[in-house]
Amino acid sequence: MHPMLNIAIRAIRKGGNIIVQNYDTQKFIKEDLDKKKIFIKNIMYKTYRIISEVIYKSYPNHIILNKNTDLIKNEKNTLWIINELDGKNNFIKNFPHFCISIAVIMKNNTEISVIYDPIRNDLFTAVKGQGSQLNGYRIRCNNINSLNYSTIAINLPLKHYAKSLFYLKIYKKLILSGISLRCTGSTLLDLAYVASGRIDCLFDFNPQSINLIAGKLQAREAGCLTSKFTENSEKKSEKGNFCTSNLTSSSKFMRLITEKISQCYSFNN
């Protein structure tokens, strides 16, 4: 096992213990939502701190960043990117679907990824060039070339709904094609699920690169491709639309999806 992967696993499991302990505790909090958010913020801080302590103990000269930090190119230093809680709203609502992630970047390349679901005890790991694993077993994405009966996850922040009904038109096109849609509230877990074949595809309408670095390596090492699903870049809302799919032997799946969404753009214009 890669020595940095070993440290990342040790750190993320310790962080997961804090998340689980407080997940059970916060069920009994009766304060208003604002106070509960402060409680969650404190949990995230503790999680980030314990993960950082484990990493610094072995690699005191490395740089550790969290998901709110702007990622800059750094050829000299090794960077550790921590997302201490992806799926925060699920956690607040006691919906057990969230995760922690660590990504290790060396010479501007993501080399190691760990995603941990502390509730299910699912540990997704990936090392560049060595594939992806779930709980120590090699995983690969599904090999499909049809939209029928496929399951697609969607990441769309609520703020986009208020601006346009355009996304609802996309949903309609996809549903009529026989697709089952999911909006789970944790894009990182969605990427891990695409990598492991639990989900066939992810549409990300609001990608935040530093948040999803770990998930993208997981998907890529499992045989997935990530690409833009529209060529139109005139509107800001369209610039960040990406599709990660389990496209392993045929481009038919991507072509069909692109065709459906292109129809929506034409109709919208």
UniProtKB/Swiss-Prot annotation:
Organism in which the protein naturally occurs: Buchnera aphidicola subsp. Schizaphis graminum (strain Sg)
Name recorded for this polypeptide: Nus factor SuhB
Record's catalysed reaction(s): a myo-inositol phosphate + H2O = myo-inositol + phosphate
EC numbers for this chain: 3.1.3.25
Ranges in coiled-coil conformation: none
Molecular function terms, GO-annotated: inositol monophosphate 1-phosphatase activity; RNA binding
Domain of life: Bacteria
Chain's role: Part of the processive rRNA transcription and antitermination complex (rrnTAC). The complex forms an RNA-chaperone ring around the RNA exit tunnel of RNA polymerase (RNAP). It supports rapid transcription and antitermination of rRNA operons, cotranscriptional rRNA folding, and annealing of distal rRNA regions to allow correct ribosome biogenesis. This subunit may play a central role in organizing the structure.
Record's keyword terms, sorted: Chaperone, Cytoplasm, Hydrolase, Ribosome biogenesis, RNA-binding, Transcription, Transcription antitermination, Transcription regulation
Family indicated by similarity: Belongs to the inositol monophosphatase superfamily.
Subcellular localization, as worded in the UniProt entry: Cytoplasm
GO CC entries: cytoplasm
